[in-house]
C-alpha cells in the first residue's frame, strides 16, 4: 500500500497527481500531514506543494475537460467531505488517462460520486442564498448566522 502525505490543499492534491505520474506509482491512500498511518503500508511519500507542477496539471486538465467540469472539481473540493481528496485524485487520473472526456460517463462510480457531491454543495449554496435572513445588531451592522453542512461559502 502506497501512502501519499500532503498538506490537504487543492494545490497539494494537484502536486500529488503530478508526482504520482512522474514516479509511475499511484497512492492507495492520501493523508494529511500529522494524520496517523494505517497499520500496514509499503511506502510513504511526502508531497511538497509546487506551483509549477500545479500549473502543469491544471493546464492539462483544461485541455481535457470543459470549464464546467473544472468548476465541478473545485466545488467538490470545497465540500470538505472525508475521502473527497482520494475521489478527486481518481477522477483527475481518469480524466488524464481517458482518450475522450469522462464528464458524462455516469457509469463510472467516481464520476457519479463527484457529480453527487457537486449537486449537494450547489443545492446548499442555493438554500443559503434563498433562506439567509439578516438581523440588524445594536451597532447598526447586519448579521446572519450560517452553519453549512458543506464548506461551500467560498463558492457563494
Language model region names:
Residues 5-6, 146-148:
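Short glycine-centered, acidic/aromatic-flanked micro-motifs in structured strand/loop junctions
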Residues 44-129:
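Charged, alpha-helical interface segments at or near domain boundaries
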Residues 134-142, 148:
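Residues lining hydrophobic/aromatic ligand-binding pockets adjacent to catalytic sites
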Residues 1-2, 129, 141:
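Short, surface-exposed beta-edge/turn micro-motifs
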Residues 10-11, 150-152:
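Short acidic, S/G/P-rich loop/turn micro-motifs used as interaction or catalytic elements
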Residues 23, 125-127, 137-139:
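A generic structural signal for short, non-catalytic loop/turn and secondary-structure boundary residues
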Residues 154-156:
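Conserved small/polar residues in nucleotide/adenosyl-binding loops
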Residues 1-51:
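N-terminal ordered "arm"
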Amino acid at each position: 500500500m502506497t501512502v501519499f502525505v500532503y498538506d490537504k490543499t487543492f494545490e497539494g492534491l494537484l502536486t500529488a497527481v503530478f508526482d504520482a505520474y512522474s514516479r509511475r506509482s499511484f497512492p492507495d491512500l492520501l493523508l494529511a500531514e500529522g494524520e496517523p498511518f494505517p497499520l500496514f503500508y509499503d511506502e510513504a511519500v511526502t508531497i511538497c506543494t509546487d506551483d509549477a507542477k500545479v500549473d502543469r496539471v491544471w493546464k492539462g486538465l483544461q485541455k481535457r475537460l470543459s470549464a464546467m467540469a473544472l468548476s465541478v472539481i473545485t466545488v467538490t473540493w470545497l465540500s470538505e467531505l472525508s475521502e473527497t481528496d482520494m475521489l478527486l485524485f481518481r477522477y483527475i487520473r481518469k480524466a488524464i488517462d481517458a482518450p475522450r472526456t469522462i464528464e458524462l460517463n455516469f457509469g463510472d462510480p467516481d464520476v457519479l460520486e463527484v457529480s453527487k457531491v457537486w449537486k449537494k454543495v450547489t443545492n446548499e449554496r442555493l438554500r443559503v442564498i434563498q433562506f439567509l435572513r439578516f438581523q440588524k445588531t445594536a451597532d447598526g451592522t447586519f448579521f446572519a448566522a450560517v452553519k453549512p453542512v458543506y464548506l461551500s461559502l467560498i463558492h457563494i
